Structure formats: structure tokens, C-alpha cells
């Protein structure tokens, strides 16, 4: 690995993509690429973060993000400690602020936060001395997911992002993944399209740097990749469509839809995915699918982020 500070990494926290420069993005991608090969070793361990403590504070359910952060930390020899809201003092009425200050008193180097409230990561970052990494806050942002999505495409496209077209289809209104991906893909020179029912388009989307569609057959024409999103029923406070079956008839990605995309178009999904609602089961394990590649990419990207924050930070 590179010597300390070679990246001139100047960030205390990772809250969203818009704080990163294009140089930062490529530092993350190149570091992830270097670390990715360790995942195929018999012994998947590096001593890089020995002696560092990482707290995974997850106040929302998670499989992929939590486990991949834990594996990422352990593969770099850090000590990772998991805290769930359901088993923390939050259940006894303790505030997020007091819980965070309690954790800080234990001298962690990084707190990785997943929370249902938009802005929770910024709140902790302003409060705490240690680094805070946003692992998803409400509808707001999920920067490491966007980075691993781009890393998955980078392994296929190389540096040839400029002029590519990517469609994001599904519940874009309630998706933090959508928001972070729109920012990152635009930074990479990609033209982004969104496709949702009108009731599931984000507020103010007309001001986003995207093309907006409500017809999947039209939206998918000629695209280089499709990112499918789950319908987030747990975030819906009212009905946005007649039924899940009616939604699937119009917005479930099928092989027929994909025939209108570029021949080598890739299919992605941040997970968890709903077969037959977000996309057809037959697409999940095809050569065009990067869905399980994204899971592997998540480990490498999160290793890279932990490495940069804990060994290359000049602050």
C-alpha cells in the first residue's frame, strides 16, 4: 500500500458524495482496486489498521452494509464493535446525542452510522471528535453504496464513464441510494435518467441533473446500465399506487425491457431486492447482472474508505 498521507486526504467525515472531489473519488476507486485482490487470498488479512477501533452503530436493519463494514474492518485488522439500537440504551429513552457521547468516551477512531433520520450523520459529525461515516441516513444519502455501485461499473468500463447513460428505476422518492448515485454519476460524466410513477418521484426532481420518465419502455432505450430500486413500503405513510401488483406491471424490469438497452447493458440493485417486483428473477443471475458483484465490491470500497480515513487523514 501507499505511504501515509500520499493521498492528501482532507476529510474528517464521510457524509455524502457532494463533499468529495473527482480526485477523492479516483483515490477511493484506485485504493479499492488495490485492496480488492486481498479478498481472493487464502488469508484475507492485512495489518494496516491494527490497534484501531471501529464502532458500527446501526439504528436500522441492515445485512449487506453492516456485514461488509465489519468484514472490511477485520480484513484490515481493526477491532470492530457492533451496536444495534434495539440492544442499546436508546430503547430505554436515551437520546442519540447522549448515546453518541457515551460511545465517544470509549475512544473509537471511527463511528459508522446507519439511522432512519435524514441528517443524523451530520448531527454526529458536528458533535464528535472521531470520524463519522454515513452508512445511510433516512432518505438523504448513502455515499458508500453509490461508491460501490460506481466501483462495480468501473471494473467493467474502466475510466470510460463520460457520455454513458444510466437509468435508475423504482422508488426514487424514498431512496437515499438514488440521491447519492445521481450526484456521483454526474460527477463521473454520466447522463442519468430516473423512472418512477409520478407519485414516487422525489420532490424538486425537476431541478436535478436528470431526465425524468414515467414509462419504463421509453426510459430504458439505449442505456448502458440500469440500477433497480426497491419499493420502500416501510417509509410510505400513504398509498402511492393501487397495489404492488399494479406497480410491478409497469416498473418491474424484465428481459423484454432490457432488449431496448445497449447490448452489453448491466443490471444493478443495492439490495435487498424483491423478485418479481423490482426486477424479474431471471435477470438476477444472468451475465448482465452485477448484483452479487456489488456485494463483493462493497467490501473493497469500505476497506478503502476505512484505510483512507484512518491512515491518510491530514486533519
Swiss-Prot record:
GO terms for molecular function: amino acid binding; aspartate carbamoyltransferase activity. It catalyses: carbamoyl phosphate + L-aspartate = N-carbamoyl-L-aspartate + phosphate + H(+). The keyword Transferase applies. Carbamoyl phosphate binds at residues 64-65, 114, 142, 145, 271-272. Gene3D superfamilies: Aspartate/ornithine carbamoyltransferase (3.40.50.1370). Keywords: Pyrimidine biosynthesis, Transferase. Its EC number is 2.1.3.2. GO terms for cellular component: cytosol. L-aspartate binds at residues 92, 176, 230. It is an enzyme of class 2 (transferase). Pfam families: OTCace, OTCace_N. GO terms for biological process: 'de novo' pyrimidine nucleobase biosynthetic process; 'de novo' UMP biosynthetic process; amino acid metabolic process. Transmembrane segments: none annotated. Pathway: Pyrimidine metabolism; UMP biosynthesis via de novo pathway; (S)-dihydroorotate from bicarbonate: step 2/3. InterPro entries: Asp/Orn_carbamoyltranf_P-bd, Asp/Orn_carbamoylTrfase, Asp/Orn_carbamoylTrfase_sf, Asp_carbamoyltransf, Asp_carbamoyltransf_Asp/Orn-bd. Catalyzes the condensation of carbamoyl phosphate and aspartate to form carbamoyl aspartate and inorganic phosphate, the committed step in the de novo pyrimidine nucleotide biosynthesis pathway. Belongs to the aspartate/ornithine carbamoyltransferase superfamily. ATCase family. HAMAP family: Asp_carb_tr (MF_00001). Heterododecamer (2C3:3R2) of six catalytic PyrB chains organized as two trimers (C3), and six regulatory PyrI chains organized as three dimers (R2). This is Aspartate carbamoyltransferase catalytic subunit. The lineage of its organism: Bacteria, Pseudomonadati, Thermodesulfobacteriota, Desulfovibrionia, Desulfovibrionales.
